[in-house]
């Protein structure tokens, strides 16, 4: 199986307690903005790029809120999913990746939970704890 890293941005509007979600055309579902890490990208570079492509927003990636893993047999992928806390620092909602994203919506945490059953304890529990992420640079031996 090929290893694939995928990143997601949990963009929270704290005043409204809503999460920004994107509607995926291919699977006709909703998810947090995100996608596969490209060669040569760090996880944070990837989550910033994916959020910009899918929402038009510039984000700052925070700590990791969740790490999930799956064997996607139909694609022959061993996928690791990294969910980052994210904060909007600029831009306006404008989908750039119109081939894969149909719409965006601010959803209540409870509504967003329905689209993400793989976070078994729910999104609220993710917001209670985090793991710092640090890119250590390039090691040359």
Positions of the model-derived regions?
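Short, charged/polar surface micro-motifs in flexible loops or helix N-caps
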Residues: 15-17, 27-28, 38, 67-70, ...
């Amino acid at each position: 199986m090929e290893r694939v890293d995928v990143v997601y941005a949990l963009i929270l509007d704290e005043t409204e307690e809503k999460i920004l979600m994107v509607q995926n055309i291919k699977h006709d579902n909703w998810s947090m903005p995100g996608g596969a890490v490209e060669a040569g990208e760090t996880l944070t570079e990837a989550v910033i790029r994916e959020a910009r492509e899918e929402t038009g927003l510039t984000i700052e990636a925070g700590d990791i809120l969740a790490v999930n893993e799956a064997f996607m047999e139909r694609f022959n992928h061993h996928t690791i999913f990294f969910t980052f806390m994210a904060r909007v620092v600029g831009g306006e909602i404008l989908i750039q990746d119109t081939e894969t994203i149909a719409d965006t919506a601010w959803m209540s945490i409870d509504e967003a939970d329905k689209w993400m059953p793989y976070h078994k304890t729910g999104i609220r529990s993710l917001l209670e704890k985090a793991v710092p992420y640090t890119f250590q640079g390039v090691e040359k031996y």
